[in-house]
């Protein structure tokens, strides 16, 4: 086997020695306070806005690392979860979790993404987070994922974000110039370099969000990785289309949209909103430069667009059903979601208090009209207010949307 073969190349050797992410010891304890973003038990309406959660999914975790596949199998007991990875130690820990929690629905394979076709399987959900940007040929990797996707299936992926990782790339270039490797002496030197950074260095903002950099494995994975690259918005879309897929949308939408929820009547944001969608996303990522990861969904070209297209620009959006996303909600006069808590206006709160996961925006507006709060305005005015409000909340990742049943 040659040194450039996926089973024996620099990335495979790295993950054999430096196990990452940090192994979870107990899934029951971990899931009380944590969740996987793309886990359908939490996010099925983001992946499939047109349908209810389906427990018997066939799920592929492509590049499962130490924990991810076991988490999906644990929270989706009726699903069949197939996991592949190039790290035997990572798969060994997945096996430990499988045995500990009785995960008979989890199947593990020592296999690179480049050899995925040898499984001869297809899937409803293909998850690949933090893997494609480490491949020698990410386009070939994305094509492998596309080839095993069912017609109504979803590819859920994460790629490194270019602008949010500028500080990481600067440090990485320094460490390459110094000839640092992945040995203990290099790690010690890298830690000292990070401690000496001035407060204005671009890495400082990244460090406030990267909570796992205390471990040597995380430091190696971030700064001393054998092969990695970062992506802009347009490069993410290009990677998807190069595999013959369609870009379905962002999982976390907030970094890619202007937010009139916070800055109403902004002429600049209004100008951004007139741009073609991908261009507007690109503009916003160059303004909100802290986003270090892109999480997005892609699907096959022959998947009917009405199954996943969310468009608030027409009155048809009044038939959408807003649902609170995971760990989002209303408490008293406050609204909260992970990392945020704020008091909406009385008019906004009146709409939020009517969200129950069943009412459409039209029905919510009707409920608000009957309560008489806020006062004034016709039903049509309230419907228009609600349509714009829930578009803003959808862009802020506060709500997901259930599409009306077709037919």
From Swiss-Prot:
Domain of life: Bacteria
A Pfam cross-reference name: Methyltransf_12
Protein name as it appears in the record: Uncharacterized protein MT2127
Organism: Mycobacterium tuberculosis (strain CDC 1551 / Oshkosh)
């Amino acid at each position: 086997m040659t040194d450039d073969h996926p089973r024996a190349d620099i990335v495979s050797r790295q993950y054999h020695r430096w196990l990452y992410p940090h192994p979870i010891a107990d899934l029951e304890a971990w899931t009380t306070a944590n969740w996987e973003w793309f886990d359908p038990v939490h996010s099925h309406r983001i992946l499939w806005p047109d349908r209810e959660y389906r427990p018997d999914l066939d799920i592929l975790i492509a590049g499962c690392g130490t924990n991810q596949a076991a988490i999906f199998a644990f929270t989706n007991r009726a699903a069949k979860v197939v996991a592949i990875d190039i790290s035997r130690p990572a798969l060994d820990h997945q096996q430990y979790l499988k045995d500990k929690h009785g995960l008979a629905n989890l199947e593990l394979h020592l296999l690179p993404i480049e050899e995925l076709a040898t499984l001869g399987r297809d899937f409803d959900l293909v998850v690949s987070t933090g893997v494609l940007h480490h491949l020698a040929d990410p386009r070939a990797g994305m094509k492998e994922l596309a080839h095993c996707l069912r017609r109504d299936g979803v590819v859920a992926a994460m790629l490194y974000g270019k602008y949010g990782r500028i500080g990481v790339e600067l440090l990485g270039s320094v460490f390459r110039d110094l000839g640092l490797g992945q040995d203990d002496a290099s790690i010690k030197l890298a830690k000292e370099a990070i401690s000496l950074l001035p407060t204005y260095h671009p890495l400082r903002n990244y460090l406030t969000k990267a909570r796992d950099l205390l471990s040597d494995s995380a430091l190696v994975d971030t700064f001393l990785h054998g092969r990695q690259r970062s992506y802009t918005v347009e490069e993410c879309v290009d990677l998807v289309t190069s595999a013959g897929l369609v870009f379905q949308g962002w999982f976390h939408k907030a970094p890619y949209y202007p937010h009139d929820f916070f800055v109403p009547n902004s002429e600049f944001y209004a100008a951004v909103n007139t741009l073609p969608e991908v261009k507007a996303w690109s503009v916003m990522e160059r303004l909100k430069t802290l986003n270090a990861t892109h999480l997005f969904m892609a699907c096959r070209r022959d998947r009917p667009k009405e199954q996943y297209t969310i468009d608030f620009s027409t009155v048809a959006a009044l038939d959408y059903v807003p649902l609170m996303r995971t760990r989002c909600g209303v408490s008293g006069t406050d609204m909260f979601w992970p990392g945020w808590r704020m008091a909406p206006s009385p008019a906004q709160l009146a709409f939020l208090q009517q969200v129950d996961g069943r009412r459409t925006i039209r029905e919510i507006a009707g409920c608000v009209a009957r309560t008489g709060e806020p006062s004034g305005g016709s039903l049509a005015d309230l419907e228009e207010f609600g349509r714009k409000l829930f578009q803003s909340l959808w862009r802020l990742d506060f709500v997901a949307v259930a599409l009306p049943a077709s037919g």
